[in-house]
Amino acid sequence: MRTDYCGQLNLTHEGQKVTLCGWVNRRRDLGGLIFIDMRDREGIVQVFFDPDQQAAFSQAAELRNEFCIQITGTVRARPDSQINKDMATGEIEVFAESLNIINRSEPLPLDSNQTNSEEQRLKYRYIDLRRPEMANRLKTRAKITSFVRRFMDNQGFLDIETPMLTKATPEGARDYLVPSRVHKGKFYALPQSPQLFKQLLMMSGFDRYYQIVKCFRDEDLRADRQPEFTQIDVETSFMTAEQVREMMEKMIRELWFEIDGVDLGHFPVMTFAEVMRRFGSDKPDLRNPLELVDVADLVKDVEFSVFAEPANDSKGRVAVIRVPGGAELSRKQIDEYGKFVGIYGAKGLAWIKVNARAAGLEGVQSPIAKFLNAEVIEGLLSRTDAQDGDILFFGAGSVKVVTDALGALRLKLGRDLNLTKLDSWRPLWVIDFPMFEDDGEGGLTAMHHPFTSPCNMSAAELAQDPVSAIANAYDMVINGYEVGGGSVRIHRNEMQQAVFRILGINEQEQQEKFGFLLDALKFGTPPHAGLAFGLDRLVMLLTGTDNIRDVIAFPKTTAAACLMTEAPSYANPASLEELSISVVAKKESE
């Protein structure tokens, strides 16, 4: 039906007859002449209708926005005075000779001036996706997946599909369950990840596996989360953690250069302990220059109990953030930051303004200065490298509260004061995570997942001291987003059972949930490691949006609903009866 795409025409096509298919983006009547901007997935071109072409001209008078049309005409150069440098096709136009109105459009339910709510855009997603901004994001997504497949194929990886209907296993979030009609009362689970299947593929000898795969998690949603999302899933045999990181870093560096034209350089590697201490986050945004600085040793003997008590407590922390130029903040602004850290459990936000660094105690302004002597002030100013015009913000309390509160404050200050370099890329690897963390009920839970191997520990040593275990795990972080994470896996039966026991999974439950895995580990399992990238997050970063729904063709809302199809919906009674399911309505009090 067509010879060319609208957005691909240029001066090299001058004089050629072309047939185009697409939509009316805009129509203009100018002094008896009709111009339209015609749009397809590749872009927009101007089409000119001359009254001398009577049939086409009379039809063009009927055109309205979003009519689906086909035109045949000749490409010609625009006069110099009419060249539009803001359009990729701005040097040419198409002189229309025939017009076919394929389909008419009713007035759009979306406003072309972009004043639509997100709910409207999701309800009429098929119209919203016609916008070049949205279409370009999905085209970039396609380029990214195409690049990943080429890279992985060239590295000798095999693209192998794993099941969508599988067994529920504890991976940190709720499962989406699918009832079985054949096996009454039993349910499949949609996979939260292909984790166990890709490990089984390594046990099967496939050595290098990858898959671009849908995953499902029934969890509370945020701007960067969806109930169904896409992973670039990778697993290898006989490779160390360092080798996996090296290969995956190479892929991401080449991807960024391909899509954005940027060389990310080599990624720094930091431990979990270091990033939590310096940045208050396990996914730090390194574009932000602010850091947390520990000062407990400097204030442990002061007569200010807010500092002295946590400074002398092994579970306490006193830390400070130096904000360049922050002395200009008003008391009202400082009070607002105090309320902000309260969200994270902080009981207040002490501060010191540095007016004259060389004057020491006499050169600072602070409600707490009266509790601190000249030696302490000098120590604080020296350790933080404070300069005239800076402000110091303090956190004091438990390690968790101080780390969380100052970590969040660091990000907020970076945005509010334009300290974060938004036009740059700052990737890193985070390694050496704790293997377990407190579950809040006196037990332990796996920080990553229960199939992660510890670093340099036997099963007996792990069982004896699980709290000190370091996981052989690694996360890739770019600009404050965790874009990928992985680990070296457990490949010995006794180690896997030891981990299960630490997590409170008894022998019977181990067999019920993971019997197939424990059996497989008995038959010559190779050492293996892997990683998974969040494709949606990668696309989000590379297209410059902060909302993951912008890079998914048909996303769900934060309530996990599809406004377009009205999913989820009620099942008809006959289907429920066939599945032996009865729906029990919740009482209002519940």
From Swiss-Prot:
It catalyses: tRNA(Asp) + L-aspartate + ATP = L-aspartyl-tRNA(Asp) + AMP + diphosphate. One of its GO terms (cellular component) is cytoplasm. Catalyzes the attachment of L-aspartate to tRNA(Asp) in a two-step reaction: L-aspartate is first activated by ATP to form Asp-AMP and then transferred to the acceptor end of tRNA(Asp). This is Aspartate--tRNA ligase. Pfam families: GAD (PF02938), tRNA-synt_2 (PF00152), tRNA_anti-codon (PF01336). It comes from Photorhabdus laumondii subsp. laumondii (strain DSM 15139 / CIP 105565 / TT01). Its EC number is 6.1.1.12. PANTHER family: ASPARTATE--TRNA LIGASE, MITOCHONDRIAL, ASPARTYL/LYSYL-TRNA SYNTHETASE.
